[in-house]
């Protein structure tokens, strides 16, 4: 049996621009693609932290070192420049490999530079900050 597990995540990237009249896709700085183990044309999920929108599109390469995160085509209606997004990809992992599977987690700063790289999530807080 195979399970669908998180493969890659770019966390809190800033949308740099949106191009409505462009073929649908998400342009991502090639340095970020390498860090997150993503490739051109790979299916990705984009979750907009600012407005709660969630959608699926695919990757196109943006120039290396540019910091570009662009939403194109109909995806451009789902975000605005300056919005924070999470970009995720999933993989089919054989049941036997599940215990050793480690996703690539890329945490961004406000300028779309890599702040931290991890291969496993941190434990969630044990108490709610709202209490």
Swiss-Prot record:
**Which compartment or compartments is the protein found in?**
Cytoplasm
Q: Which UniProt keywords apply?
A: Autocatalytic cleavage, Cytoplasm, Decarboxylase, Lyase, Pantothenate biosynthesis, Pyruvate, Schiff base, Zymogen
This enzyme catalyses:
L-aspartate + H(+) = beta-alanine + CO2
Q: Mind telling me which HAMAP family this protein's record contains?
A: PanD
Q: What is its EC number?
A: 4.1.1.11
Its name, as the record gives it, is: Aspartate 1-decarboxylase
Q: What does this protein do?
A: Catalyzes the pyruvoyl-dependent decarboxylation of aspartate to produce beta-alanine.
What does the Swiss-Prot or TrEMBL cofactor note state? Binds 1 pyruvoyl group covalently per subunit.
Q: Which NCBIfam families match?
A: panD
Q: Which organism is it from?
A: Leptothrix cholodnii (strain ATCC 51168 / LMG 8142 / SP-6)
